[in-house]
Design a protein with these regions (language model features):
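Short acidic/polar hinge/loop motifs at secondary-structure boundaries
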Residues: 126-153
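Short, acidic, small-residue-rich periplasmic hinge/interaction motif at the N-terminus
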Residues: 28-69, 77
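Structural signature of Gram-negative outer-membrane beta-barrels, strongest in the C-terminal barrel
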Residues: 242, 343-345, 373-488, 526-527, ...
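Extracytoplasmic beta-strand/coil segments of soluble accessory domains associated
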Residues: 80-126
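Flexible loop and strand-edge segments within Gram-negative outer membrane beta-barrel domains
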Residues: 29, 219-226, 230, 244-329, ...
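Gram-negative outer-membrane beta-barrel transporters
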Residues: 392-395, 486-488, 507-578
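Short strand-turn segments of transmembrane beta-barrel domains in outer membranes
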Residues: 156, 168, 173-203, 214, ...
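Outer-membrane beta-barrel signature, preferentially recognizing the C-terminal barrel domain
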Residues: 264-287, 325, 378-380, 428-430, ...
Length: 603
């Protein structure tokens, strides 16, 4: 229930909006005829059909292929951290993130973390996370996959269900847009025997298209026992059945070997991980003037082998057991979006997801050598239907509303609503207000694995209230925006003393009370020069680790002929590294300088 303060705040927003809209309605038609919108504002995240972002009431950031290539990073996460306000990812070295103890690659969006399954990564709209642990695998999200990345900041549970509670990162995979053959090789060598390679071939001929990519990356790391090695490939085949119907199939497989050396004060030995992740999908899409839709199937899987290592300085010896897991997630997604009359768009969709796996410990030494201890072997199902409604009212207002009914095989049914208004004002000003609910079901680890497990956990839920203002100036060369949000969440799962016995127990006892401001601006000075900046402030009543209070980025790029140079500086302030009675925060500054020369069309 919205408390009195939030009701008053929303009332003021709506009143201000009404005053702005009524100021000069007659003059708006003239303003509309001269307004210019950038083509990269057409998105598929936050809506199931390609939509001008102006008509959405939620905040969506787009990082295009040019930005990804300029970053010269094998992983997508660094470029997203730079370009998306409110999003922060942890890192631990030159390359690679790893899993389990000492892992980095934790993704936080407005204080909600993917590590706790409160935000989701998608590939072409399909959920991507470990079936048992429910979190994204950071090393699986490589730059070679992406044509662009869209980040929806705020709940996206109406369209994507559980785990999209705090937002989603949607990786839109690459494709060839015109006939021809394009081959690109990226190779680099640097300190600590660091090697980066990527080879991509894209083809389009008539109705057929293909993308084939492969990569190999490695480093010794800046510390002993911190090596990282990764290799993988991606393939996508597409065929235009008719002018209106298309089908494609794709597969991505990556394997990485990572080592964790422990803290400098107490080095760890044999902290090794061997991880393989795979993603595959098949989709048939249709696209007509007044209707579009898709039917798709996806299957994700992972094999994990982990040695947690030991600390000699603490008198420890090599561990007897090795952790193993096999997880998977599959699903079917159907939707059709239709325009029934002018300015209207209604989408009906259906999702079925099945996820889970098994985990066990293999004992390779000690008294239990040659035996196995099973930890979990479970699968759960989700089935959901949803409706997303959008209606233009005149030229100055778009109404958005949505509802999802989601059923979990063990927990039951959740109703997830959202609503919002987008006002298209004179002088290319956009004003948006929204209220949306996010939720997540307990993951298998919380319900069934390790001593704190609790099979009676309930879903977490939250409401996000937001107002956003943006404007485009100078014939589209300058744009800026500001977002203000408030998050009110309940039933967060926490590990606390068992109220009915000894030990610890996972319980629905936590709350979220976050508020923040996000600012962004970009200016295309001329054909060669461009600059951009973003800043986010986050206030958390209950702070969490790896969620900074202040995040600032400012950068610029210069392109001329075959040369391209870009640079950016990032400031992180109030980054929590420890919470509780004695919280600890850190600040740091990171400066990047990148240069690129295209020797040929393919190198």
């Amino acid at each position: 229930m919205i408390n009195k303060k939030i009701q008053q705040w929303l009332g003021v927003m709506i009143l201000c909006t009404a005053l702005l809209c009524s100021k000069d309605i007659q003059a708006q038609d003239a303003a509309d005829s001269t307004r210019l919108y950038m083509i990269d504002e057409v998105v598929v995240t936050g809506t199931r059909n390609a939509t001008d972002v102006r008509h959405l009431s939620q905040a969506v950031s787009v990082v295009n292929r040019k930005k990804i290539e300029q970053s010269m990073q094998p992983s997508l996460l660094p470029v997203l951290t730079e370009n998306v306000p409110g999003l922060f990812t942890t890192a631990r070295g030159i390359m690679g993130y790893g899993v389990s103890g000492g892992a980095a690659g934790g993704i936080s969006l407005r204080g909600l973390s993917g590590g706790t399954a409160r935000m989701m990564v998608l590939i072409d709209g399909h959920p991507q996370y470990a079936g048992i642990f429910g979190h994204p695998i950071a090393d699986a999200y490589q730059s070679l996959l992406a044509d662009k990345v869209e980040v929806l900041r705020g709940p996206a549970s109406v369209l994507y269900g559980s785990n999209a509670m705090g937002g989603v990162i949607n990786i839109v995979t690459r494709k060839m847009h015109e006939d021809g053959v394009h081959t690109n090789l990226h190779a680099g060598y640097g300190s600590y025997n660091t090697v980066e390679t990527e080879l991509t071939n894209m083809v389009r001929k008539g109705r057929f298209s293909s993308v084939i990519s492969g990569s190999y990356n490695r480093t010794d790391g800046h510390r002993d026992d911190m090596g990282f090695e990764q290799y993988g490939g991606y393939a996508k085949l597409g065929y235009d059945i008719t002018d209106n119907w298309n089908m494609y199939a794709d597969m991505n497989v990556t394997h990485f070997n990572a080592s964790y050396p422990g803290p400098v004060s107490a080095p760890l030995v044999d902290g090794d991980q061997h991880i393989t992740r795979g993603v595959s999908s098949f989709a048939v899409t249709n696209n007509y003037e007044k209707t579009s839709g898709s039917a798709s199937f996806f299957y994700n899987w992972g094999n994990h082998w982990i040695n947690d290592g030991y600390t000699p300085s603490a008198g420890e010896t090599s561990q007897d057991g090795r952790f193993n897991s096999r997880d998977n997630m599959m699903g079917v997604s159907l939707f059709q979006s239709t325009q029934f009359f002018k300015g209207n768009r209604i989408t009906f969709g259906f999702d079925w997801f099945r996820y889970g796996g098994k985990a066990w410990t293999n004992y390779v030494a000690g008294e239990r050598e040659g035996t196995r201890n099973d930890l979990v072997d479970k699968h759960e199902d989700e089935i959901a239907g949803y409706m997303d409604f959008r209606q233009d009212i005149g030229k100055w207002l778009t109404l958005n509303a949505g509802l999802r009914v989601d059923n979990h095989s063990r927990i039951g049914t959740e109703w997830i609503p959202q609503t919002g208004l987008a006002f298209h004002l004179p002088h290319a000003i956009e004003l948006k207000v929204s209220a949306s609910k996010g939720f997540r079901y307990p993951i298998l680890r919380e319900m069934y694995m390790f001593p704190p497990q609790n099979p009676d956990l309930k879903p977490e839920s939250m409401w996000n209230y937001e107002i956003a203002l943006s404007q485009t100036l100078l014939n589209g060369r300058l744009n800026y925006g500001v977002n203000v949000f408030y998050i009110d969440g309940k039933n967060l799962i926490m590990t606390l003393p068992n109220p009915n016995g000894s030990g610890m127990l996972n319980q629905n006892s936590g709350k979220i009370d976050n508020a923040g401001v996000e600012l962004m601006a970009a200016y295309r000075i001329n054909a060669n020069w461009s600059v951009d900046a973003n800043y986010s402030f986050l206030h958390m009543k209950n702070p969490v680790i790896a969620a900074p209070e202040h995040k600032l980025y400012a950068g610029g790029s210069f392109t001329k002929g075959r040369w391209s140079v870009s640079s950016g500086i990032q400031y992180i302030g109030g980054l929590y590294t420890s919470v509780g009675d004695n919280p600890v925060t850190e600040n740091f500054v990171l400066w990047n300088l990148r240069g690129q020369f295209s020797a040929t069309k393919w190198l």
